[in-house]
C-alpha cells in the first residue's frame, strides 16, 4: 500500500497530465485554425464563433456541475469528464459541416467543464493550506505546458495525419488517460478507509466545515463576486492568447506554421513558469507570516496588472522579437493570476464547497472568455490588425484587478463543526 506522500504525488501527477491533455484538446482548433478555414471555407467571424462555442458551453455548464462535483467527488466527476470530452474531440475530426463542428465544440465545453473545479476539490482533500500553494502551482502549470507543447506536437500530428487525424488521435489519448485515472486514483477518503487510518490533523487549519447549503447561496457572499468578476480578466486574456496567438504571429508578422508553433510554445513555457512561481511565492509568503488570503490577493492583482501592462505595450509594437518577449512576459504574469485565483478558492471556502465556489468563479471567467475570440475576430476583420484587441484585453485585465482589490475580503467567521482551535485558526486565514 502506498504512503500518503506517494498518493499526494500521484494526485499531482494525474491532475497535471489531465490538465495537459485538456489544454492540448482545447488548443487543437487554434492550431488548426488556418488549415480548417482554408479547407472548409470558414470566415474569421465563423471561426470566432466556433472557438467561442466551447467557452460559452464551458461557462454555462459550470453552475449546475459545481454542486454535482461536490456530491459525486473528484474521482467520478473527473473521470466522466475525460470520457465525454475525449469522445467529442475525436468526433471533431470526422465531420465537415459548420453547424456540426460548432455542436461538437459545445459538447467539448460541457465535457471539460468539471476538470478544474474537480482538481481544486482533490487538492483541498489531499493537501493542507500551507502546502496547497505549491501543489496548485504544479497542477496549474499544465494549463500552460499543454498549450506550450501543443503547437509543435499538434503541428507534427497535422503534418503526418492531417487536421482530422490530429483530432482523432488526441481524443484517443484522453480515453486512455481516463482508463488509467479510474484504475489507479483514490480519493483521500478511499485511501483512509482501505488502510484503516485516521486522517492526521492539519498543521494549519482549513476553513471550518459548514452545513450543506444550496450553491446559489454563495451568490450572497461578497467574495463570490470578487472571484467572479476578478477571474473574468484572467480568462479573457488567457483565452484571447489561446485562440488567436498563432493567427496573430502568422497574420501580423508573416511567420510560417513551424516558426509560429515554436514562438507560441515559448510564450506558454513562460506561463508555466509563472504558475509554479505563484505557488511557491504564496507558500513562502505564508511561511513568513503573511495571512493566507492576503498572499493570494497580492499575487493575483500583481499578475493581472503585469499582464495588462505588457499587453498594452504589444499593441503599439511592430518588431517581431520585441512582441515575442512582451507576450512571454504577458503569459508569465497572467498565469500567476490564474494559478493564484484557484488558490483563493481553496482558501476562503471549506472543502465541501470548493467545487461549487470554483465553478461560479469559472462561470464568470468563461463568460468573458467566450467573448474574447468573437470580439478579437471582429476587431481584426474591421481594423486589419490586432492592436485594438490587445488594448481591450489590457483594459479588461486592469478592471479585474480592481475587482479583486475592492471585493475580496477575509470571510466572516462561521460556526466550526470541528475543534474550536480549528475554527479560531480558520477565521484568521480565510487555491487551471
Q: Residue ranges of each PLM-predicted region?
A:
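Juxtamembrane intracellular "pre-TM" segments in multi-pass secondary transporters
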Residues: 2-4, 192-228, 252, 423-426
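Structural signature of the two symmetry-related core transmembrane helices
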Residues: 76-90, 294-311
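A late C-terminal transmembrane helix in Major Facilitator Superfamily
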Residues: 346-383
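Helix-loop-helix hairpin linking two adjacent transmembrane segments in secondary transporters
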Residues: 139-189
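Conserved MFS/SLC helix-loop-helix module at the cytosolic interface between two early adjacent transmembrane helices
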Residues: 60-96
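Extracytoplasmic gate region of multi-pass secondary transporters
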Residues: 29-30, 221-276, 338, 342
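Helix-breaking motifs and short loop linkers at transmembrane-helix boundaries and internal kinks
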Residues: 41, 73, 94-100, 128, ...
Amino acid at each position: 500500500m502506498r504512503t500518503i506522500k506517494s498518493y499526494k504525488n500521484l494526485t499531482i501527477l494525474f491532475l497535471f497530465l489531465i490538465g495537459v491533455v485538456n489544454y492540448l484538446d482545447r488548443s487543437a482548433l487554434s492550431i488548426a485554425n488556418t488549415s480548417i478555414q482554408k479547407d472548409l471555407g470558414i470566415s474569421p467571424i465563423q471561426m470566432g464563433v466556433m472557438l467561442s462555442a466551447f467557452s460559452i458551453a464551458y461557462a454555462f455548464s459550470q453552475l449546475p456541475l459545481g454542486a454535482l462535483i461536490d456530491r459525486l467527488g473528484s474521482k467520478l466527476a473527473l473521470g466522466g469528464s475525460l470520457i465525454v470530452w475525449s469522445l467529442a474531440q475525436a468526433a471533431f475530426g470526422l465531420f465537415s459541416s459548420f453547424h456540426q463542428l460548432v455542436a461538437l465544440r459545445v459538447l467539448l465545453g460541457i465535457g471539460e467543464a468539471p476538470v478544474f473545479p474537480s482538481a481544486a476539490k482533490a487538492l483541498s482533500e489531499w493537501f493542507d493550506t500551507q502546502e496547497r500553494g505549491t501543489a496548485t502551482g504544479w497542477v496549474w502549470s499544465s494549463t500552460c505546458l499543454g498549450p506550450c507543447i501543443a503547437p509543435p506536437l499538434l503541428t507534427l500530428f497535422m503534418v503526418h495525419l492531417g487536421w482530422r487525424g490530429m483530432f482523432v488521435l488526441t481524443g484517443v489519448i484522453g480515453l486512455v488517460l481516463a482508463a488509467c485515472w479510474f484504475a489507479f486514483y483514490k480519493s483521500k477518503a478511499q485511501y483512509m478507509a482501505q488502510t484503516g487510518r485516521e486522517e492526521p490533523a492539519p498543521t494549519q487549519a482549513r476553513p471550518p466545515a459548514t452545513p450543506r447549503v444550496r450553491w446559489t447561496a454563495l451568490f450572497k457572499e461578497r467574495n463570490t463576486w470578487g472571484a467572479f468578476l476578478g477571474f473574468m480578466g484572467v480568462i479573457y486574456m488567457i483565452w484571447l492568447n489561446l485562440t488567436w496567438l498563432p493567427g496573430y504571429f502568422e497574420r501580423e508578422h508573416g511567420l510560417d506554421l513551424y516558426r509560429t508553433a515554436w514562438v507560441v510554445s515559448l510564450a506558454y513555457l513562460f506561463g508555466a513558469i509563472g504558475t509554479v512561481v505563484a505557488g511557491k511565492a504564496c507558500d513562502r509568503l505564508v511561511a513568513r507570516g503573511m495571512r493566507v488570503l492576503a498572499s493570494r490577493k497580492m499575487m493575483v492583482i500583481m499578475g493581472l496588472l503585469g499582464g495588462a501592462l505588457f499587453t498594452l505595450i504589444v499593441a503599439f509594437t511592430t518588431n517581431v522579437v520585441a512582441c515575442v518577449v512582451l507576450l512571454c512576459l504577458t503569459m508569465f504574469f497572467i498565469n500567476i493570476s490564474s494559478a493564484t485565483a484557484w488558490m483563493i478558492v481553496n482558501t476562503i471556502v471549506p472543502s465541501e464547497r470548493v467545487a461549487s465556489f470554483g465553478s461560479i468563479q469559472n462561470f464568470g471567467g468563461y463568460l468573458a472568455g467566450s467573448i474574447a475570440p468573437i470580439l478579437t475576430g471582429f476587431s481584426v476583420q474591421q481594423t486589419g490588425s490586432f492592436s485594438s484587441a490587445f488594448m481591450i484585453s489590457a483594459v479588461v485585465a486592469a478592471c479585474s484587478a480592481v475587482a479583486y482589490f475592492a471585493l475580496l475580503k477575509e470571510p466572516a467567521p462561521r460556526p466550526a463543526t470541528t475543534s474550536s482551535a480549528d475554527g479560531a485558526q480558520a477565521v484568521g486565514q480565510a487555491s487551471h
